[in-house]
């Protein structure tokens, strides 16, 4: 469960990056090789992504994972 403060911040950052790129959850999921429901769970802060899936999502967003983590830590 990702309901920690960092988990919620990570969820907001991922959603913000997805929307900024004009991607639907489905399009992001397809690009990252994960299920659309997985993206939704992560974005709602209900599930913490594995390190591998976080990297896949960041790559699909064309954003370094370190940038996403840094933004989440600052929020």
What positions do the PLM features span?
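A detector for short, charged/polar N-terminal pre-domain segments
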Residues: 1-9, 71
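Short basic helix-loop element that most often maps to the first helix and adjoining turn
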Residues: 12-31, 56
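Conserved hydrophobic/aromatic packing and binding residues within compact polymer-binding modules
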Residues: 14, 28-29, 39-42, 68
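Recognition helix of helix-turn-helix/homeodomain-like DNA-binding domains
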Residues: 33-47
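DNA major-groove recognition helix of helix-turn-helix/homeodomain DNA-binding modules
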Residues: 52-67
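Short amphipathic recognition helices of helix-turn-helix/homeodomain-type DNA-binding modules
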Residues: 67-75
């Amino acid at each position: 469960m990702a309901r920690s403060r960092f988990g919620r911040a990570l969820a907001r950052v991922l959603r913000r990056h997805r929307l900024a790129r004009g991607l639907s959850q489905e399009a992001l999921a397809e690009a990252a090789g994960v299920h659309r429901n997985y993206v939704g769970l992560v974005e709602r802060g209900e599930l913490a992504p594995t390190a591998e899936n976080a990297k896949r999502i960041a790559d699909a967003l064309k954003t370094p994972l370190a940038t996403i983590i840094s933004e989440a830590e600052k929020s």
